[in-house]
Amino acid sequence: MEITDNHFHLDPSGRKELAVKDFIKAGGTRLVLVHKPYGTWKKIDSFQSQVKTTLKLAVRAREAGAKVAVVAAPHPIELLKLLEFNSPSQASEIYFEAVDYCTSLVEEKKTVGLGELGRPHFEVEPPVWDLANEVLTESLSRAKEVDAAAVLHTESATPEVMADLS
């Protein structure tokens, strides 16, 4: 039987393949490696560099013996960080550049999907919430265009939130 962790993070300054070996020792066989931010990025090249780090970590996880699928996308919190330095339209544009980079990785078969896409899991001002919803909707549309899986990051998993997302 395959034992899968469907939301596994690795950090380049963390335990890396040692964490994967612990997972395998516990009976795990497969994992979905979900990209996470390794620091604030303001431009697309910094984001791409971080995703390339995730892809390298996936290679190390495979070398440790796990079957690995990778998902990558700009984390929802990154939109808020981009808003600190940019107008809403500029922040959205940079965010979508990152989404498009991630969809290209799906097309190149380097990843299986986009993740984590979503919304802040804490309260934000209504205009920011609205922008996060617009960005999420468009990001999911772009994921659908390349038949990519989507890993969602949401504020909770209540029936109300699920209805709002559908």
Where does each model-flagged region fall?
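Mid-domain alpha/beta scaffold segments of enzyme catalytic cores
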Residues: 1-166
